[in-house]
Amino acid sequence: MNHLPVDFKVDRSNISDTEWDLRVQLAAAYRLVDYFGWTELIYGHLTARVPGPEPHFLINPYGLNYDEITASNLVKIDVDGAVIDDTPFEINHAGFVIHSAIHMKHSEENQVVMHTHTREGMAVAGTKEGLLPISMFSTSFYKRLAYHEYEGPSLFLDERERLLESLGDKKAMILKNHGLLTVGRTVPDAFIRLHALERSCQIQVDAGAAGTLNTCLLYTSPSPRDKTVSRMPSSA
């Protein structure tokens, strides 16, 4: 039984309308991740940088399931891991390391970060080949997908620079032997990209289970007549 104060409500008087709207969107994204079955108990994280000059971002409270996340119980922290608001919750340190690595750069393109440990995502992350361009979803990541070598649980701050270096200017990354990660300018942007990456991995695992992976058509480069790849949300 979960004895954490799920119904905790943050003091709205200290929160701007812009931040509150961001909280609502991020909490909704947590519910969608739960709806699609992408959760791994209480692990994995979706975070969003709070608008303003301070390096603050929102993260899920440690110990709550995704279907328990609300706009009020999201935790606001800085890139050093300090909790900003008065809250009874703690945060997951490994999640802090991964997400603060991206938020500390303060890129307008990477305001939102989403990271999952799905079965299919981890299966693809554990292969030497990585993601193969065999579907309309995975082809949208052709030459647009980063990879990060596995260093064990992300508990040490010095990994942050290597995470940033691995991501580069890409908007999606496979953490080898670990899981999936997407970034975006907005919550919907990052979520749509995550959906495409998750579907890509599901299709690849299904093709492998059917014994047809070796006969799949591998996409190589866009045709001058086909601009589909540039229009896919995951590649924008």
Annotated model-derived regions:
Residues 219-228, 236:
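Conserved small/polar residues in nucleotide/adenosyl-binding loops
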Residues 145-198, 205:
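A contiguous pocket-lining binding segment that forms or flanks enzyme active sites
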Residues 192-221:
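Glycine/small-residue-rich hydrophobic helix-like segments
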Residues 19-26, 41, 91, 95, ...:
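Generic structural signal for well-ordered, non-membrane alpha-helical segments
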Residues 22-114, 121-132, 138-139:
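An anion-binding catalytic pocket shared by soluble metabolic enzymes
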Residues 16-20, 85-93, 146-154:
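Flexible, glycine/proline-enriched loop segments at strand-loop-helix junctions
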Residues 2-16:
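Generic N-terminal amphipathic, Lys/Arg-enriched alpha-helix
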Residues 119-161:
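Class I SAM-dependent methyltransferase SAM-binding "motif I" and its flanking Rossmann-like core
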